[in-house]
């Protein structure tokens, strides 16, 4: 089947199922809850959903620890519920991509239960076992090896100890994942978001790492020697037979890495999630090590990939997901007075770059980070482990508290605010994670009734995006003021047609005469988060112009 590259025209909405909508009032979101809200998504204007894991799981890491790839977690529903959801999405012109977690499974998966029984078990080499561990550490701040007394051996886990890494060197493992991918594509699923996909190949020497601080040994397990071979094999043997897309989560990858992963004729991934732009307010790409946001640094990072992938590869455009904190209050937009304006500014600035937009649930109404009274309110496994690690370091309590509050994955996992009722319309029972008090004024129902709301701005933005899709998809990008510390101004040019974005990332009025450079063009304002339009931009004002001859 010919791949139509439909992902280049997609507007993708991420659903984190346990926090989206609870249909049976058990405090946990579910598939029937998603079905209830499909008309809302259709009205928003998106045309694809990325669904975080709904597979069978003990939920040690909220579904990223899978015990059966071909079953649905019972709290989320049944396979019949899933099939109905997929059918109802397709009826509304909405495609579905699923999370594919292929670097690790749950330790409760049948493969691992067998693997740990004995050294000569047929499933032994499905995982990575060593008689002695090296010094690698993983992404949750722990040692990356866990001792198992049954066979007096250690298994590798780059995430939680209940998430053992699978051994992609084993051809049987690769066959298993091809079969899993085919199973879901045959159901009609439209593609996959591939979780930490650039970790699947490890350097087989298993050398000790040199970095004494974080992710010890990462040079030996990130972008490993056979990564491209494995991805090409999966594409050749399975994906190429379907009109589907893949987006890879590729941590700590460079521009050159991403070119290799996404260049069309290499047949590996459609695009990747690159996190450089979400790391401009931290050190070393580690969200817990905070530093002040710099717009100049932010632009430089985005420019690198806009220019670097213009002729080869493809960009993903995002601020938020289930691992990132909320964008409102971040990226120099932490002035509560301008919460609405800054949310609109962020949307306009990001989504007219070249690439595929990803919107995370609640982002379209300006949901904020989790409101906590104590660090004990955070229940995420990563947060708990990192907090333990930070408490052992020579850091002040104030710094640790701020880091945990800003960095916790729970920030984006607060249940969706549908209305201002006790549990925000998410459920009639106490949710698995508490809702925010600001549900009283940040919720879908109120947003739908307010013409100037963030939600209605997103709807308008998506309509504009579709109407000017040729420029958005193919227009040449140029950053017009790369060294300006407060303004982000860029153009997308396609022949004599230009989309011009002018954004003020500050809480003060700023004069901007950029339009003087386009006097020979006819001017039309397509989007504006204020009622006025002049060469003096108001705080957090963002304007999208259409210029034509």
Label each region the model flagged.
Residues 6-7, 229-232, 238-241, 245, ...:
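Loop/helix patches that line or flank the sugar-binding groove of alpha-linked glycan CAZymes
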Residues 24, 57-61, 104-111, 200-203, ...:
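Short catalytic/ligand-binding loop motif for oxyanion handling, primarily in non-cytosolic enzymes
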Residues 216, 315-335:
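Active-site clefts of carbohydrate-active enzymes
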Residues 533-549:
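C-terminal beta-strand-rich structural cap/linker in extracellular carbohydrate-active enzymes
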């Amino acid at each position: 089947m010919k791949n139509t590259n439909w992902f280049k025209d997609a507007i993708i909405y991420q659903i984190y199922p346990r926090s989206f909508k609870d249909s049976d009032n058990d405090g946990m979101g579910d598939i029937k809850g998603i079905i209830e809200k499909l008309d809302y998504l259709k009205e928003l204007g998106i045309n694809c959903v990325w669904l975080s894991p709904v597979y069978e799981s003990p939920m040690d890491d909220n579904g990223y620890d899978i015990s059966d790839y071909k079953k649905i977690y019972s709290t989320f529903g049944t396979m019949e519920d899933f099939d109905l959801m997929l059918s109802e999405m397709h009826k509304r012109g909405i495609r579905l991509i699923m999370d594919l977690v292929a670097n690790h499974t749950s330790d409760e998966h049948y493969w691992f239960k067998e693997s740990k029984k004995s050294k000569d078990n047929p499933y032994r080499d499905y995982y990575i076992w060593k008689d002695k561990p090296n010094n690698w550490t993983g992404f949750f701040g722990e040692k990356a090896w866990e001792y198992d007394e049954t066979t007096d051996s250690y298994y590798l886990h780059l995430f939680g100890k209940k998430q053992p890494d699978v051994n992609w060197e084993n051809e049987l493992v690769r066959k298993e994942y091809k079969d899993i991918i085919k199973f879901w594509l045959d159901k009609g699923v439209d593609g996959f978001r591939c979780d930490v996909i650039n970790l699947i190949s490890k350097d087989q020497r298993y050398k000790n790492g040199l970095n004494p601080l974080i992710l010890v040994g990462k040079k030996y397990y990130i972008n490993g020697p056979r990564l491209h071979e494995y991805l090409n094999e999966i594409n050749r043997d399975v994906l190429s037979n379907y009109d589907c897309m893949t987006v890879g989560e590729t941590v700590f990858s460079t521009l050159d890495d991403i070119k290799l992963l996404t260049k069309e004729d290499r047949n590996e991934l459609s695009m990747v999630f690159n996190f450089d732009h979400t790391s401009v307010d931290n050190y070393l790409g580690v969200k817990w090590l905070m530093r002040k946001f710099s717009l100049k640094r932010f632009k430089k990072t985005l420019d690198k990939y806009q220019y670097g992938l213009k002729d080869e590869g493809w960009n993903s455009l995002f601020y938020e997901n289930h691992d990132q904190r909320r964008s409102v209050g971040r990226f120099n937009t932490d002035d509560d007075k301008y919460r609405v304006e800054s949310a609109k500014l962020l949307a306009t600035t990001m989504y007219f770059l070249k690439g595929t937009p990803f919107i995370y649930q609640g982002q379209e109404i300006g949901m904020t980070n989790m409101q906590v009274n104590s660090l004990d309110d955070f229940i995420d496994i990563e947060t708990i482990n990192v907090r333990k690690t930070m408490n052992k370091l020579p850091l002040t309590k104030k710094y640790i508290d701020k880091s945990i509050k800003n960095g916790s994955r729970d920030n984006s996992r607060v249940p969706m605010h549908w209305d201002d009722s006790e549990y925000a319309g998410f459920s009639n029972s106490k949710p698995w994670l508490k809702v925010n008090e600001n549900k009283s004024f940040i919720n879908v129902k109120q947003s739908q009734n307010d013409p100037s709301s963030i939600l209605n701005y997103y709807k308008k933005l998506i309509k504009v995006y579709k109407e000017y899709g040729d420029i958005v998809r193919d227009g040449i990008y140029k950053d017009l003021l790369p060294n300006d510390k407060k303004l982000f101004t860029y153009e997308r040019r396609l022949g004599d047609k230009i989309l011009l974005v002018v954004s003020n990332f500050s809480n003060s009025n700023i004069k901007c005469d950029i339009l003087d450079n386009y006097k020979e063009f006819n001017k039309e304002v397509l989007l504006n988060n204020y009622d006025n339009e002049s060469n003096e931009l108001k705080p957090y004002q963002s304007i999208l112009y259409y210029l034509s001859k």
